[in-house]
Amino acid sequence: MEREKFQQKALKQTKQKKSKSAEFLMVKEDREATEGTGNPAFNMSSPDLSACQTAEKKVIRHDMPDRTLAAHQQKFRLPASAEPKGNEYGRNYFDPLMDEEINPRQCATEVSREDDDRIFYNRLTKLFDESRQGEPQDESGREETLNSEAPGSSNKSHEIHKEASEATTAHLEEFQRSQKTIILLGSSPLEQEIRSTSLHCMEDEMSHPWILLLKVTAVIRSRRYYREQRF
């Protein structure tokens, strides 16, 4: 009996303790709900609320970028954008280069090569025209012209022929060097052999000046056409 009484008494004490702790917690929650837990955001009468809100707004504005196009343009607007620059993006890739983009060294070398080729071409055409005009129809006419020619004119024509032959050989040597250094990609050994035989035939044609003259003029014309198409 005493044991049962002791157990009942212990149960009552635990129930009282639980009820007291529950009442204490409920009172504390009600007090926090009415007064706030020290956070100025829950207390509308606190003077720190406006300062906290402005600080949060500043932080948010600093962290988040502006989404509008006007703000983006104002941020990244350059000071020199007001100066007229013209239609920069309207220029095509294949348009001729501007003055500031041209390399003066490359331009000078190309101009000098064009001048040399033009002078050489004019000399060859002049020599070719003179030879065609002065060539007789038969051997009798050739003998008469040779007998009637003065020594001064013969010397002059000999100098012109010599100068043209020297220029022709110089251009031919340069052309042969450039052709020998070229290696065609994907070319078979047969094609390379054909190319080497064509170079040997060109060397053999050195003894025939008119064939050589025609070939050199064709090369110069092709180079001039390529440059005109390029620029």
Swiss-Prot record:
Alphabetized InterPro entries for the sequence: OFCC1
Segments of this protein annotated with the region Disordered: 1-24, 29-48, 127-166
Domain of life (superkingdom): Eukaryota
Amino acid composition bias (Polar residues), ranges on this chain: 36-48
Keywords: Chromosomal rearrangement, Methylation
Disease: A chromosomal aberration involving OFCC1 is found in patients with orofacial cleft.
Name under which the protein is recorded: Orofacial cleft 1 candidate gene 1 protein
The organism of origin for this protein: Homo sapiens (Human)
Taxon lineage: Eukaryota, Metazoa, Chordata, Craniata, Vertebrata
This protein's encoding gene: OFCC1
